[in-house]
Amino acid sequence: MVDYTIGEGMDVITTLNYYGFGDPLLLLAGICPESGLEILYGLLIFVRMYLSGVFFSWFCFEKKHTKRTAVLLGAVSYVFCEYALFGGIRHPFFLNGMMYLPLYLLGVERILQKKRYGIFSVAVCLSLISNFYFGYMNTIMMALYVVFVLFPQPQKRIREKAAILIRMIGAYLAGVMASGAIMFPVVSAYLSCSRSGEGGYTESLLQYPEWFYDNLKEGYFHTNLYVGQWTTLGFTYLAGVGVLILFLRWSRSRRERLRNWALRIGFVLLTVMLCVPLAGRVMNGFGYASNRWDYAYAMLMSYIMVVTLPMLLHLLSRRLPVWIEKTNRHLAVVAGVFASQRFWCALLSVVLLVNLEANIVDAFGRDGCTKLSEYSQIGTSAGDDQGMTQMQADSDGFYRIETPWHIGNQSLEEQYQGHNWYFSIAPGWYFDYYHQFLLNSMERKYSLRGLDSRTALNEVAATKYYVAGQEENPMVPYGYKYIGTNEAGRYVYENQNFLPLGYTVSGWMKKSDFELLSPIDRQEVLLQAAVLEDDDADRVSLMPSAASNLKIDTAQEACTVVSCSGITWDKNMLHVTQDGGSIELRFRGRANCETYLWFNEFQVKWAAAQYQVGSVTAAGRTNQFVLMDPRKSAWYDEPSQTVNLGYSKEPVTSCVITFPKRGLYSLDEFLVVYESMDNYQTKTDVLRQDTLKNCKVETNRISGDMNLSKTKLLQLSIPYSSGWSATVNGKKAKILCSQDMYMAIELGSGRSHVELRYMTPWLKAGVGSSAAGVVIIWMMFFGVPHVRRSRKKKG
């Protein structure tokens, strides 16, 4: 299903699954009143943490660990590791990986013990539908666990091990099949999303910078430090003691020796993985290096504690009293107290709880990894109300609202169509489209903070209203007229040249030619032609190319540096020597233009803050641009930016650039580009000559009528997706990807009824897979055991 309040029209399943769409626990939201949703949101954090401890304990008991105190302390240590305190409370869905990993390993153990293995399939299914990203990481950890547990067993022959492995793979695939309705579409979307490629970490893949290892040592037992690359450790000292005992104590039993050697090797392996960026990249779906999998490391540490705590209790209750008596006979009474395992269990429990309390205080303290000051009070989660809901209800038809640099995803909460979004699984072509214009508000590959008040970009995106704050001189695009304030008291401007959802163009340009133009020239093309893939353009034979007829009303010039404060610029290196450093530029200016400042070949080499927002002030208006250090995980290779200085009837002749923090930047030059508005209305009038009439926008369906005097391309301000299909007068029509972003359909002369329908890609195949998977799992629980019992009775 497509939802136009998600981004600019993204798929519900593929976009929201990363945030819990599909999580069975979130079904509770369906019966919870709206007023209680925030409370439910908070409660589910602790429910997930509790279930993580329950499943961990279940796994330990399945492993025949009967010392309940050891299991309880291990579970508590696991539940309150730094990963849960930092990642789990900040992003509750991050707890899903932590919650289901013990179930994965429990399922493996049950298969090894020749018990029912339906639980394993159910765990795989629930994990993948809750969040396939963490399901992927759990799968890798499960595979490592199988290697360490199955293959070292000398009593099992190779043939027997192969049979067990085949059963595991079969049970795993059954779980994958059952999750297909959600997993198939999501995996398909992930493979084409902008976040799945390289980015963020730019150093060697074999070792992190020295600062990472310094932080790693300090953050191993402390929660008041963020190590970096999503590495969250903060273990208890008791867990550290468990590791020491594991490596120093020798077991007499062969079975225990094999188990302990497996744990030692596993500990070393996971520690090495923490320290090698390549491992972080593999675990992060071959994106940037990230150690979000370190909840598995926390589980290993907690399990080592469960294994070694009985050894520690034996040493303390047996060896220590003997040593005390030998040292001083007068301490026999004390030795008698120390000989009680209950005493040591109680004492170690207190020590662990005090340690955890200190970790929690450190984590949420002023210098902690997750400061309380970063969270909002309950009841204020929606931020400042923009009054968009009422605006959307008061107007007919499909349109979008521009609210520059506003809160991402608030359009989803307030139910209006906008341009502000932040989604980890966003289609890759969204980024490709905005990247063509070096759009400064595309702060990350998966986050858009509005369209930078750019007239052309808003026009082709069906933007009807511009909502600004109460500043004296807002950066309103050309052609927008003030119509009053909305219910939130914000200024509202209406687009006088509004292009509806469907409009027509009579020319096209090949993408290869489009890419030869400068960023602002490309904006000019959007208003005159459809930009098509070269193969598609060759097939549109009835339409003349508009390349030779385009009118590009732009000009550019170099800037002159007037003054610098806290900044030096020499040999293409811009050095900001103090916080708040600024540089003033002068240029001739041009009337009736949208003026852009172009940071040409501009990159952060080093900055005091990994993420900062700079500002450019011109003609009393201020705009923003993002500065991201290569150390930041969201960094991507963007050598230039363009920043809109706004539309003005009078020439804009100067601007001041401010850098919040110290840093070193490479920069070839500052350029100013002017986009004239002299012929703007003429261009939009041409596009409005033939528009989609009787347009209806419904759930997964768009329809309307056209009456053309000649062949044209119907351009739709809906993002392209393979999930859309189209018919014209009942016959299937090809949907073209236009502008690298939107959809276009070629229409002949005469009357045409156009209808588009949406189906989530891979959803049909996924539903069929889920049906088959559920049947197989049902057979695992009920069918196979019934057959076995019948055979035993006959025997």
Give the residues covered by each predicted segment:
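Extracytoplasmic/lumenal acceptor-recognition loop(s) of multi-pass membrane glycoenzymes
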Residues: 8, 18, 354-374, 391-460, ...
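Active-site-proximal, structured, solvent-exposed surfaces of multi-pass membrane proteins
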Residues: 548, 554-795
